[in-house]
Amino acid sequence: MTLVPMVVEQTSRGERAYDIYSRLLKERIIFITGPIEDQMASLVVAQLIFLEAENPEKDISMYINSPGGVVTAGLSIYDTMQYVKPRIATLCLGQAASMGSLLLAAGEKGMRCALPNSRIMIHQPSGGFQGQATDIEIHAKEILNIKSRLNYIYVKHTGRELSEVVASMERDNFMSADSAQDFGIIDKVIEKRLDIDV
C-alpha cells in the first residue's frame, strides 16, 4: 500500500484536508510517476481536460518521474497534451524513460526542463506476442508502424533529422540532463526554481 501524504489548509469555513496530489492539481501541477499504463493515463488525460476547462489561458506544469510503459497509454497523454489549449511545461525529476521521455519532449518549446541528476532514456518500442503465424505477422507490422510514428514524434519535438532519431533509438539510449538538452528533448537544465520561468 502506498502512503499519500495529506495537506491540511485553514479556510474561513474551517479546516480542509487534501491528498498532496489533489492540492498540487489546484496549483495546475500534474504528476506522472511510475509506469505509464491505461488507468494512470486516463487520470492524467482527465486532469489536463479539467485544467483546460477551468482556465484555458493558464499554463500547466507536468512533473515526470517514470520508467515508461504502455505505448498506447502514453500516446493518449501525448495527444491530449497537444490537443488542450494551455501551454504545458514539462520537468523531469528522477527519470523519464521510454514513453516518459516522449512526454517530456512534448512540452511547450522553451518550457521543457530537467533537474541536473535526471536520467532520460529513449529507445524503440518493444512487445511480445504469441499465436498463429498470421497473427504474429499482423502484430509485427503494428509494432513497426508504432516505431515509425514514435520516430516522427521525436523528430517533431527535438528538431533532429529522422536518420539521427532512428539511429539513436536503435537500442536503449540513456542520457544525462545535459545530453538530453543537446539532443533537443529538453530546453534547459535547472538546479533551482529561480532558474525557470514557468
Curated annotation (Swiss-Prot):
Where is this chain's protein located in or outside the cell? Cytoplasm
- UniProt protein name: ATP-dependent Clp protease proteolytic subunit
Taxonomy, top ranks, is:
Bacteria, Pseudomonadati, Pseudomonadota, Alphaproteobacteria, Rickettsiales
One molecular function GO term is: serine-type endopeptidase activity
Under the heading NCBIfam families, the entry gives:
clpP, PRK00277.1, PRK12553.1
Summary of the function given for this chain in its UniProt record = Cleaves peptides in various proteins in a process that requires ATP hydrolysis. Has a chymotrypsin-like activity. Plays a major role in the degradation of misfolded proteins.
Origin organism is: Ehrlichia ruminantium (strain Welgevonden)
The protein's matches in CDD domains, at most eight in alphabetical order, are given as: S14_ClpP_2
Top EC class, one word: hydrolase
Q: What is its main location?
A: cytoplasm
The record's InterPro entries line, in alphabetical order, gives: ClpP (IPR001907), ClpP/crotonase-like_dom_sf (IPR029045), ClpP/TepA (IPR023562), ClpP_His_AS (IPR033135), ClpP_Ser_AS (IPR018215)
